[in-house]
Structure formats: structure tokens, C-alpha cells
Amino acid sequence: MTKPDFDDIFMELAVNLAKRSHCIKKHVGAVLTKETRIISIGYNGPPAGTHNCDVEFPEHGCARDSKGSCSLALHAEQNAILYAVKNNTAVEGSTLYVTLAPCLPCARIIFSMGISKVIYLFSYAEYKGIGSDEGVDFLKKFGVEVERYQKEIEVNDKLV
């Protein structure tokens, strides 16, 4: 039997974490690792102690800000980073596995926190219908290693 490599294990976990999201629009999961050890996990949704979108706004999702983004939700990357920092875990030099490429604001946080590598499953640009993955472009421009996960993986009972 062949053992799975850590990239496969961590991306599979990110995919499963995405299923925990209460967001009506998109489910995203993230795993933050350092030297093959998990240091934090996250998925998109409102901060703990606030309302879940699928419960509070089941027909249309949470309220939107002036740019059309959810006004309540934290992104999966933000949740993973915030939880690590809240628990005094250093994230500098870590690797982030995420099911959706980071948006530009998340990319700025990733870079600022010293995360050295990002592996993502789906393109944010394709999801949003925009020209490029601005977050990925930003990270690459400033020296963060970024790669798209290329192996087949099961997401919502389908191989992608």
C-alpha cells in the first residue's frame, strides 16, 4: 500500500473542513501546517458568537457590503491564521492549504504573517468571474511560493 503524501492529507482535510461552513454562497476550508504538522485549521463563516448565515438568512445568505462581499464572514484563511495567533502559535514559515485561492485581502494577510507557501485547489478568479487570481499574483510578486493542487480529489462526491 502506498502512503499518501502530506499535500494530499492536508488538502483532503481542507476539503472536509469546507463542509463545516454555514455560508450559503461558498464553502472554503484551510489548513495551516509547519514541518508536516497541523498548527491550525479554519473554514469561512461568521466570527464565533455571531449568527450563522444559513440560519439567520436562509433564503439569500448574509448581508452584503458595498462591494458585494459578505459583511459578516471571515474567510477560511483568516480563521486559520487568527486561531493560530490567538493560541500563541507562530505562523511564520508555515504552509497554507486552502480550497479556494486567496483573495487579495487574504493574500496581504498571508504575506504580512510570513506564511511561506500556499497550495490551493480552485481558482478564485474562475469562481468570481474575474480576469486573474489577484491574490495569487500578489503573493508570487512578493516571494511567497504558490501552487495549484494538481491531483484528483473528491469534492462533494465528485472527483475534480
Enumerate the language-model features and the residues they cover.
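Zinc-dependent deaminase catalytic domain
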Residues: 1-160
